Amino acid sequence: MHQELIRELAMITDEERRILEGKQEIDPQLYTEKKEMVVDSAKLLKKGKLIQVRPHTRFVHFPAHTHNYIEVIYMCQGTTTHIVNGNQVVLEQGDLLFLNQNAVQEILPAGEYDIAVN
């Protein structure tokens, strides 16, 4: 992968900055307005868009959740560990993971150089 793109994707996001400053959990309001953890496409997609590519949030455990859309994860560099329907899945550079709306996913903390997009 082109190093300029990797540098761009590796930049610390506002959410990651809060995590690094001591907030040791994700902010559910960034992902859903429901009590149960169903990641809502309306919270992530720009108005009028049907697809959005964003860097995976690193440095924090992402608790078990589902999505109201199909999620595609591409591992650009490093590794990430996912628990999908109770099974451990380790993504390495170049891997793709497709998750339907019924898949229950949990993500273990990723490091600074573990770069994925979803």
Task: Describe the function of each predicted region.
Residues 1-79:
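Generic protein-terminus/edge-of-domain signal
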